[in-house]
Design a protein with these regions (language model features):
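Zymogen propeptides/activation segments of proteases
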Residues: 1-153
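Extracellular hydrolytic enzyme modules, especially secreted metalloproteases
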Residues: 117-119, 123-218
Length: 218
């Protein structure tokens, strides 16, 4: 069967993706819009490749994703206001703040009135690294009931600005979460043994397994 699922990102062709950078009103960012443009688009980024390079190689040149990165959008609220479960509220507020500056129709690649994909970077580190309930765990999910300028905003992925030791987030986490946007499932033990068993998954050999953490740049 085809991998394509309802409202997912196209799996072949040259397409546009939007990356939204979100900051809080009481925090400062370490990395710039240009830094994330390199992470997403620069050929041979950091010696191993960018997000674009990864999906070009994995698709044997059939999927070419050009990412437009917004400037940092500073929210009205403090970090603690949104908390670890505030991703949808953050995204909604940030998109509303810049809706006059960006045309979401550019990122509806198939013209069906739905934004094909939205990749979000939030200031700071992710809960998967800090263990803090104040931080957001990187994930892929869906927004219900948000339409901006006639375009429905549904699927999104969200990742942190920093990975560890104040290093910029690696492409592995971004590629992993975006894999869900293409219709790919997780291939690791998603409940970490709480159901009474453990699943080794596909390990470091698969971006949807442990491969998102391979090396300094994922």
């Amino acid at each position: 069967k085809k991998l394509q699922v309802s409202n997912s990102f196209p799996t072949k062709g040259k397409h546009k993706l939007l990356m939204l950078l979100i900051n809080y009103n009481d925090t400062e960012t370490l990395y710039t819009q240009a830094d994330f443009q390199n992470v997403m688009n620069q050929e041979n980024y950091a010696g191993t490749g960018s997000f674009r390079d990864y999906y070009l190689e994995q698709s044997f040149g059939q999927l070419d994703i050009e990412t437009t990165v917004t400037p940092w959008v500073k929210l009205n609220g403090a970090k603690r206001y949104y908390g670890s479960e505030g991703a949808v509220a953050m995204i909604t507020e940030a998109l509303r703040m810049i809706e006059d500056e960006i045309d979401l129709r550019e990122f509806d690649n198939d013209g069906d009135g739905v934004l094909d994909g939205l990749t979000v970077i939030h200031q700071g580190t992710g809960q998967e690294m800090t263990g803090s309930s104040a931080d957001i765990w990187s994930h892929s999910s869906e927004i219900i009931g948000l339409t901006i300028d006639g375009i429905a905003v549904k699927r999104y992925t969200i990742q942190p600005e920093q990975q560890r030791e104040e290093k910029i987030t690696n492409i592995g986490v971004i590629c992993h979460e975006f894999g869900h946007n293409l219709g790919a499932p997780d291939f690791y033990d998603t409940d970490y043994g709480q159901s009474g068993g453990t699943y080794g998954g596909t390990g470091v050999w698969d971006i949807m397994g442990g491969g998102a953490w391979n090396g300094d740049n994922g």
